[in-house]
Amino acid sequence: MLFENWKENLEPLIDKYKGRKHPLHYNNTYQLLIMVILSAQDSDANINNITIPFFEKYSNLESISNSNIEEITPYFTKVKNYPTKTTWIFEIAKLLKTDNNIPINLIDLVALKGIGRKSANVILRETNQKTEGIIVDLH
């Protein structure tokens, strides 16, 4: 039966995709967090493009938290559902205050607005932490 040997059945997929670099072009956990939030229901290519000027101006969570939502919104107008995502990013910056406070465990990540289990597992995987489940993206 297929489900009895699920680990064996997944090995070809794991072998095929193991070691592939994530399509979001980030340099640190802060950038990854922001990009993962923005990429929901949007293309990684779009997020890679629109975040370049944003990260030039806002290099960390502290710089966002010292700003206001009206200042950061124009950077995200080409992102699907940008009003909601912009609010989440601003609220996360206010909550965490610094990049050092970005959680790297599933429970604390999913407690953040805009971060569900899939997004949390992407962040965990990319920061070399233990993940739960298989991360699948269909776009």
Feature annotation, model-predicted:
Residues 1-102, 106:
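N-terminal polyanion-binding entry modules of DNA glycosylases/AP lyases
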Residues 33, 37-38, 89-91, 102-139:
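Catalytic DNA-binding helix-loop module of base-excision-repair DNA glycosylases/AP lyases
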